Amino acid sequence: MLQKNITIYTIAEKLGVTPSMVSRAFNPNASINEEKRKLILETADKYNFVPNKLASRLSMHKIKIGVLVCWKFAPVSEKIVDGIKKAYKELADYKIQLDITLVSFAEKKPEECEDELNKYIDYDGVILSGFGDVNSSEILKKFSEKNPNVVHVQNAPQDCEYLFASMHSPDIASALSAEFLYNCLKRSERKNILLLTGNPKSVLHRTAEAAFRESCRVFGLNLIEAVSKDDSGNELSDMIPSIFEKHRGMIDGIYITTGNSVALCEYIYNNRIPVHLVTFDIHDKLNKYINNGTVSATIYQNLEKQGRNAFEKLVHYLIKNEIPDKKIYTNVELIMKSNLGLYTY
């Protein structure tokens, strides 16, 4: 069992003292009763607690961080938020107020979330997810003019200012998928590939499509069609039967760039279609199709780490003025049935 993270607050609770007293005990120049100091240091040593270099942050004003997630697909947004919450708990030594707002894309599109966004106008920093649609540009521009400390998760807008983005590289993901499909089909005379992407107004999906087209050219794959449709509802999944009817058994490989791929997997499985399928992300409903062989491989972008990186780097910027890289990438990995267990708990 993992040991509970020990923080200044843990030590304070065990000894019945204030967190600020615990913080002062580690400063030899701070005014504190020597018996109290000795007790605090002995307790800290007992639990192998070493104060963070930024523990002096306890005596300063509270940092306020807002999170606004406009979600289309719950398994994606949940993992991002989990990563943010875990990072928040690990940085419990600092005075941080974390407020999270979740908005369903079915109820409100990102460009309609100006009121929710403006609640955070006076916060020290803001983390956004789901605002990769070009339609969001106007409200993002207006907001960043008033609060420049904006961090994007999973996407990086092209035409508005932001502090940094925490994301995967869609170029690498597309190249990896194309190379995998090539290796599956390299001994076949026919190498017909279908590409399915999500919202065509999304910078992320557009980048992924362009990179995949180029990778197909490099690896000698025949991209017979690229379909871009809104993946927030059933628009993409409703087209699946007609796509397969159109190509009538001529599809050898498929890459889908959205995590909302269960309908595609169901169709392929139920109709026993022999095709090499590369999907995106892992979640309970998709894992079933990885295990039964419908999905040949899936791209893992580590959404939880994207959320964690966003929060940690933002806090370090606000406290220490550490300037982060403009884009912080998680590793892109390929998951198959044989290693799926390493990524699911």
List where the protein language model places each region.
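Flexible loop/hinge segments that line or gate small-molecule binding clefts
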Residues: 133-172, 283-295
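Hydrophobic alpha-helical segments within soluble ligand-binding/sensing domains
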Residues: 164-192, 284-286, 301-319
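Amphipathic helical "hinge" segments at domain boundaries
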Residues: 50-114
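Hydrophobic alpha-helical
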Residues: 125-144, 224-287
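Hinge/cleft segment of the Venus flytrap/periplasmic-binding protein
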Residues: 200, 214-216, 302-345
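Hinge/beta->alpha junction and helix N-cap segments in small-molecule ligand-binding domains
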Residues: 70-79, 100-111, 166-175, 195-214, ...
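N-terminal helix-turn-helix DNA-binding module of bacterial transcription factors
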Residues: 1-61
